[in-house]
Amino acid sequence: MVVDLPRTDPEGWDADRMPEVPIAQTVVWETHVGDFSNDPAGGFPESHRGKYLAFTDLGTTLGGHPDFPTGLSYLKKLGITAVQLMP
């Protein structure tokens, strides 16, 4: 089998750029995909819990309370600049 990799690139692939965060200001968070989004009170759709898809959910909160963000909103509040995902 031969794969034509450029054909697999989604639209805008070549325009995508990594955020420019100086290494001294980089804060890395390591998490398991399941642990990140498994809690039913975390505000994630049930079909996204424990899956990579949960990282696409914006504005999630604990129990619907706006003062307690979850997911990427929580990491942003902490100042996390990079996430290492564990399966």
Please identify what each model-predicted range represents.
Residues M1-P87:
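N-terminal structural segment of carbohydrate-active enzymes
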